[in-house]
C-alpha cells in the first residue's frame, strides 16, 4: 500500500545520483557500485524506481517470513508469531523504509539474513555444515553487506569472528 501511495518510491539525493549512474551506464564507487548494479539488474526487466522498491518489499517480506518460521520451529507460539508479523507489517517505519531507494535498505535486509543464518546455526549446530548448500551460502551471505555498504566490513569480520567463537572444537580443518 505504501508503494502505491508514494509511487514510484522515495528517493534522496544519493538515490538520484545512483539512478543517473544506472541510467547512463556510468558508474562511480562513491556509492558502492554493487548496489547500483543491483538496481540496474532489476531495471533491465522494468525500468522504474518502483521495480526496485517492489523487489525490496518482496525480499524483506520473504526474509522476515523465513525468520518467523525459524522462530516458530524453536517453539515460539503461533499467536506471538502472528502478532510479530502484524506489527512488522503495519509499522510506519517499515512501510516507508521498504519503499525508499537507499543502499541502507538492502544492507538491512542482508544483515537480517546474516542473523537468520546464525539463528539456523544455533538451532542445528554442526549439522548446519553437513549440507553443501549451507557451506556455499554462508560466506556469500556474510560478504554481501560489505558489498552494499563500506561499513559492512564490520559485519563481515564480526560474523566470521562469531563463528570462530561458536565452534571452538571445529577450528581446525582436516585436509583428509
Where are these regions (language model features)?
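Transmembrane-helix signature of polytopic, membrane-embedded enzymes
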Residues: 67-90, 108-109, 128-129, 133
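Short helix- or helix-capping micro-motifs
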Residues: 81-92, 116, 142, 146
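Transmembrane-helix motifs of polytopic, lipid-linked glycan transferases
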Residues: 54-75, 113
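Transmembrane-embedded, aromatic-rich helix segments that form part
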Residues: 151-166
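Specific aromatic-rich, kink-prone transmembrane helix
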Residues: 23, 66, 106-126, 142, ...
Amino acid at each position: 500500500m505504501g508503494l502505491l501511495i508514494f509511487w514510484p518510491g522515495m528517493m534522496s539525493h544519493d538515490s538520484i545520483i545512483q539512478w543517473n549512474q544506472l541510467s547512463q551506464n556510468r558508474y562511480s564507487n562513491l556509492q558502492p557500485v554493487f548496489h547500483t548494479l543491483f538496481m540496474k539488474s532489476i531495471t533491465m526487466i522494468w525500468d522504474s524506481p518502483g521495480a526496485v522498491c517492489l523487489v525490496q518489499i518482496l525480499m524483506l517480506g520473504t526474509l522476515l517470513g523465513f525468520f518467523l518460521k525459524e522462530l516458530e520451529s524453536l517453539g515460539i507460539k503461533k499467536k506471538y508469531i502472528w502478532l510479530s508479523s502484524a506489527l512488522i507489517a503495519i509499522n510506519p517505519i517499515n512501510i516507508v523504509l521498504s519503499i525508499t531507494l537507499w543502499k541502507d535498505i538492502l544492507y538491512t535486509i542482508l544483515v537480517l539474513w546474516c542473523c537468520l543464518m546464525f539463528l539456523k546455526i544455533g538451532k542445528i549446530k554442526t549439522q548446519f555444515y553437513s549440507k553443501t548448500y549451507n557451506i556455499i551460502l554462508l560466506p556469500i551471505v556474510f560478504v554481501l553487506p560489505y558489498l552494499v555498504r563500506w561499513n559492512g566490513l564490520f559485519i563481515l569480520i564480526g560474523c566470521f569472528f562469531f563463528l570462530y567463537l561458536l565452534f571452538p572444537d571445529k577450528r581446525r580443518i582436516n585436509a583428509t
